[in-house]
C-alpha cells in the first residue's frame, strides 16, 4: 500500500504575548502558545523589545534583534525550548 504524504511548512504570520505566554498565529489558522519561560531572553525583555520582531523567510522563523533571539516555527511545533 502506498501512502501519499504531503508535507507543508508551518509559517508564522503574527506574534503576540500575554503576561506568561508567547502566542504565534500561523498562516494556516493554527495557533501555537508556549510559556515565555522557555526562552529566557524573551522572558526578560521589555514589551517594546518583544514587539520588535521580524519574520524570517516566509515566516519559517522569528527574530528579535533587540535581544538577539531566533526561534523556528518548526521547533515550536516540536516543543523545542
Outline where the language-model segments fall.
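Motif-centric detector for short Cys/His coordination patterns
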Residues: 1-81
